[in-house]
């Protein structure tokens, strides 16, 4: 179970929402055999298909980084990225081989940011206070590590920096 397909699909979701303006996003293959595109995989262990095992996929958890936190009626917020000198990076919310970020405000007032790290190395991500003020963010991470499936990995306040492991997805939820 790796993040390869999960990251690829997360990048598609990001582009569909950020650039194509998609208002919803669905995945049609929920369960399947040994297919890379099944959210849940089933494996038979006998020739009569009477016994087997069922496993979740990293793809399911990557989709969950969006679907668990971004609720119906949410509004997408603009995201700006700056380099180390403070200069604005055009289209900085999308480095297809690095960090991709989208942000949302749910109807209940909670904020959500989904950050994809497509790179093969750890990246830093700073949360500027901007319109969200001094928000406390819960961090959830999905990565190649066993058990790191929307795993709560700590909190961070606006204005601080978050380390995002290589080839992982984090969701930050704040109020």
Predicted segments with their positions:
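Glycine-centered loop/turn motifs
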Residues: 71-78, 134, 159, 167
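Flexible loop/turn segments at secondary-structure boundaries
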Residues: 32-37, 120-123, 146-149
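Hydrophobic, well-ordered secondary-structure elements that form the walls
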Residues: 16, 63, 113, 139, ...
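Aromatic/acidic polysaccharide-binding cleft in carbohydrate-active enzymes
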Residues: 1-90
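C-terminal beta-strand-rich structural cap/linker in extracellular carbohydrate-active enzymes
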Residues: 152-175
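Carbohydrate-binding surface patches
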Residues: 86-135, 167
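Active-site-proximal beta-strand/loop segments in catalytic clefts of secreted hydrolases
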Residues: 27-31, 116-119, 142
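Solvent-exposed beta-hairpin/edge-strand motifs
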Residues: 130-148
């Amino acid at each position: 179970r790796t993040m390869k397909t999960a990251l690829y699909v997360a990048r598609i979701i990001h582009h569909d929402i950020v650039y194509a303006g998609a208002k919803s996003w669905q995945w049609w293959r929920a369960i399947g055999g040994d297919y890379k595109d099944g959210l849940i995989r089933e494996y038979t262990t006998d020739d009569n298909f009477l016994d087997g095992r069922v496993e979740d996929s990293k793809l399911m958890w990557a989709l969950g980084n969006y679907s668990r936190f971004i609720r119906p009626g949410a509004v997408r917020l603009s995201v700006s990225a700056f380099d180390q000198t403070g200069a604005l990076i055009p289209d900085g919310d999308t480095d297809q081989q690095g960090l991709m970020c989208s942000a949302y405000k749910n109807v209940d007032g909670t904020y959500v940011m989904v950050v994809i790290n497509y790179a093969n190395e750890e990246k830093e991500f700073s949360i500027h206070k901007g319109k969200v003020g001094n928000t406390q963010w819960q961090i959830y991470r999905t990565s190649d590590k066993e058990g790191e499936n929307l795993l709560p990995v700590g909190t961070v306040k606006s204005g601080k920096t978050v380390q995002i492991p290589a080839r992982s997805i984090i969701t930050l939820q704040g109020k």
